[in-house]
Curated annotation (Swiss-Prot):
This is Putative sodium-dependent multivitamin transporter. Its main location: membrane. Keywords: Cell membrane, Glycoprotein, Ion transport, Membrane, Sodium, Sodium transport, Symport, Transmembrane, Transmembrane helix, Transport. PROSITE patterns: NA_SOLUT_SYMP_3. Belongs to the sodium:solute symporter (SSF) (TC 2.A.21) family. It is a multi-pass membrane protein.
């Protein structure tokens, strides 16, 4: 077992110390984290750059570096096509979804669902998100522990605890500002880790052309799978359609990302952060994909898993570091630091978002209902910090359970698809369909979640079959390799006997969840309204149900509703119900002012 040198440990220690120092710094400067808004939303004063980097780092973490590289090593480059879905989905998130949330100015994205449908819908969605993040955090902490075990021999227990403690410390102490600033330099170290692999392979191969040619000769360069079969793991359709649904579930309606977008100064800044995140995200994705080809070039004649040197594909990248970077002082430490940072940035984001959701969606309503009072800002801040500590401890516990999960990349994207897809459908239903009601929305969500969990976790599933791996250049006996190969061949031959829904590609989970929630909720809403079991009165501003709260819908629909309601505007009193609180106003609704009405009459 190889070990890190003194310079490697020095680099790793400096990286951890900087993260802790940033947390301490933001605890004692500026507002000193003395208000809930500053602690959870950075006082809504952040610039575009840190938010853009944080949007990327929050989810494209150690799972990306270890998982995507092995995806290309083992299955080829078809996964690269998913970057097109990022390009297609960014304008949808920036110009349709985010404006709706930005108007709310709230710490929890799920408050929208209470305004649109009711508290029961908000609670159901918030609980689903919490489950999603708790499952995901285990994978994220487990990944760097796996890397350190392969590179240094340090136990997974020690590595998991170090990552969890450091991350929890600076996130709890420094709040959102510390999280966003650390994400910048942690993102740069993530890139450094990936490019250290590429450059090392480049030096040893002599040119990038050699690496590309070897990958091409061995079937790794594959961008022509246009199959419409949903059971094929990666095709153009799975990557673009499934990728769009996954991207929007993460960057459009996920609390962790929207909370970052709420930390900037204006809606235009939030849109700019999303657009700047796009090239950063694609650059990391593409470079990580190519790093997988670099690693394949090095092990093309002796696959480490078939040789028995590692226990899973996710350990191959750290093994490459052991085999190639030891001669370069500090380079292995740089790689391990990048893996650490990839995990730290994600966990800190998850801790912050779970604290915000628990406070806003569970604790505050509970206190209001049971104690008949509201929390002061000082109490809210104190509870936020306690919740951050709790979720930091929870992420350490979940990491110990992640070792039983298979491939990191597929596990992570499956979780986002199974839960994120239905949540995307729920928000889309609320923002696009004025006739949707609460019972229909909850019914669609529950049906979709049940279906996605069924196909996502139902067993037995056919094992994943990789492209050909060679052991011709290995110096030891190949009996172990032959056993694995024979088991794989048998599994492929019997794949058609598996239940069809269990064979569906994991990339379709988000799209299927979205469609079932959206159309199922739409149909159920129509049925419940027909039977007079529910209505959609919450979307109206007045008691007569004539003026719709257009801000609850995406901008194109909101503008259409505005124009339609212009003749209904009066200067007399109107009733406005927001979040269950009814208020009386002596003027027209504030979002439909008299100036717009005068312009409308002039045009007419």
């Amino acid at each position: 077992m190889a070990t890190l040198g003194a310079w490697d440990y020095t680099i790793l220690a400096v990286v951890l110390i900087i993260s802790v120092a940033i947390g301490i710094y933001y605890r004692f400067v500026g507002g000193k984290q003395s208000t809930t808004t500053e602690y959870l939303l950075a006082d809504r004063s952040m610039n575009v750059a840190p938010v853009a980097f944080s949007l990327m780092a929050s989810f494209m973490s150690a799972v990306t570096i270890l998982g995507v590289s092995m995806e290309n090593y083992q299955y080829g480059t078809m996964f690269v096509v998913i970057n097109l879905s990022y390009v297609l989905s960014t304008p949808v998130a920036a110009y349709l979804i985010i404006p709706v949330f930005y108007r709310l100015k709230t710490a929890s994205v799920y408050e929208y669902l209470e305004l649109r449908f009711g508290y029961a819908t908000r609670l159901a969605a918030s609980l689903s998100f919490s489950l999603q993040m708790v499952l995901y955090m285990g994978i994220v902490v487990y990944a760097p522990a796996l890397a350190l075990e392969a590179v240094t021999g340090l136990s997974q227990v020690f590595s998991i605890v170090i990552v969890g403690v450091v991350c929890t410390f600076y996130a709890t102490l420094g709040g959102m500002k510390a999280v966003l600033i650390t994400d910048i330099y942690q993102s740069l170290l993530m890139f450094a880790a990936v490019f250290s692999v590429i450059i090392c392979a480049w030096v040893k191969a002599g040119s990038l052309e050699v690496i590309w040619r070897v990958a091409q000769e061995n079937g790794r360069i594959n961008l022509t799978n246009f199959s419409v079969d949903p059971t094929e793991r990666h095709t153009w359709f799975t990557q673009i359609l499934g990728g769009c649904a996954t991207y929007l579930a993460i960057y459009g309606v996920n609390q962790t990302q929207v909370q970052r977008l709420m930390a900037v100064k204006s809606l235009s800044a939030a849109r700019a952060a999303l657009w700047w995140c796009l090239p950063i995200l694609c650059l990391l994705s593409l470079s990580t994909c190519f790093s997988g080809l670099c690693i394949y070039w090095y092990y093309r004649d002796c696959d480490p898993l078939l040789e028995g040197r590692v226990n899973s594909r996710d350990q191959v990248m750290p093994l490459f570091v052991v085999d190639t970077m030891g001669e370069y002082t500090g380079l292995a430490g740089l790689f391990v630091s990048g893996i650490f940072c990839a995990s730290l940035s994600t966990i800190s984001s998850i801790i912050s978002s779970l604290a915000a959701v628990t406070l806003e969606d569970y604790l505050k309503p509970l206190v209001s209902c049971c104690a008949k009072r509201t929390l002061t800002d000082r109490q809210t801040l104190w509870y936020s910090k306690l919740l951050s500590l709790f979720f930091g401890a929870l992420c350490i516990g979940m990491a110990f359970m992640a070792g039983s999960i298979g491939g990191l990349l597929q596990a992570a994207l499956s979780i986002f698809g199974i839960i994120g897809g239905p949540l995307l459908g729920l928000f889309t239903l609320g923002m696009y369909v004025t006739k949707a009601n609460e019972k229909g929305a909850i019914g669609g969500l529950l049906i979709s979640l049940a279906f996605c969990f069924w196909i996502g976790f139902g067993q037995p599933k056919p094992p994943l079959v990789s492209l050909d791996m060679s052991t011709a250049g290995c110096p030891v006996d190949r009996s172990f390799a032959r056993d694995i190969f024979l088991k794989t061949v048998i599994a492929v031959a019997e794949e058609e006997h598996y239940f069809y829904l269990y064979r569906i590609s994991y990339m379709w989970y988000a799209a299927l969840g979205f469609l079932i929630t959206f159309f199922g909720g739409w149909l159920l809403s129509w049925l419940f309204a027909l039977l007079k079991w529910d209505n959609n009165r919450r979307i109206y501003q007045d008691a007569d149900c004539t003026l719709i709260k257009h801000d609850l819908f995406v901008p194109p629909i909101a503008k259409r509703l505005q124009r339609r309601q212009m003749p209904l505007l009066v200067v007399t009193g109107t009733s406005s119900e927001i979040g269950g609180i009814t208020t009386e106003s002596a003027t027209a609704p504030p979002r439909l002012d008299e100036i717009e009405w005068e312009k409308h009459k002039a045009v007419a």
